[in-house]
Amino acid sequence: EGGRMRMSPFKVSAISITFFPVRQRGVALISVLLIVAILVALSTQLLSNHNLVVSQHQNSFEQNQALQYAYGAEELARQLLFDDFSISGPGVDHLEETWAQAVLPFKLDDGGYLEAQVKDLNGCFNVNSLIGASGNDNLARLKRLFQSEDVDRGLADLIKDWVDIDQVTTGFGAEDNAYLGLTPPYRTANQPMRHISELFLLNNIEFEDISAILPHLCVIPSAANKVNINTASASFLYSLDAAVSIDAAQGVVESERSFLDVKSFIEANPEFEVVAPQLGVTSEYFEVHAKVQVGESTMSLASLFFRNTETGEVTLLQRDFAKFFQSKVVVDIDADS
């Protein structure tokens, strides 16, 4: 009024500030931390599962690679056996031929190594020859073989009782009654052996004994025991007859053995004339044994082949995986090199 200036009224909006109690703020912080912990746990679990899946795939891949390498070694041996027949001729087999040379361990591109060897099964004692009409004669031979290796002769009785069809204990052997008392209990096979690794099942047999006799024993799917004089070990040759001395057998092995016929062998080694009908210079049965390692995976494959003496055709009779592999060398591979 009059000379006074009149001020315009204005409104001030009220600002509402809410203060949480200390307890509520603590609960909120714990909730956040709990959520973070759950997320971390889930992430860790997912990462762990992922690593497990990757590891499983890696192991599966390495195992498959090892298997393929083993098959490759098997096929190479088959081809070598066929080439030996078709190129060198069917008349003779000896240890200087290509098939008899072991594939020494060598490194693989995928990391690891491969080793392979071919064993002539006509150059060793066929344990299945303990069955049949000549079983007792062959048992006596097996005992002489064990004697030459300083192994208990009673183990021969154990092997005979394992493969024969009866339950009559032979000498120091054992039938079902001895095995059923073991833990776990089991029975004798009472049938021909399928693989020489069955020796590990024999009652009270020691690993040292198996290591000593294994190079001289083999399994052929028949009771035949035809001996290839060009590939047989000294102990096996010595076992053939009491008239054969260990010195004579050792002399044969230490000579260059590539006899073309039994007649020339007998002329050079007359002590063997008594067993001439059981001797030969060719082989029909072979075992190819390969061991492969790829990464952390190891594969052992034993393959039994029969080679037809008329056509040279090589037939796969059976495969056995994870069998005992007796290497011919000691290998020390530096993974970083």
Indicate where each model-derived feature is located.
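N-terminal leader/signal peptides at the extreme start of proteins
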Residues: 1-25
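Compositionally biased linear targeting/interaction segments
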Residues: 2, 27-337
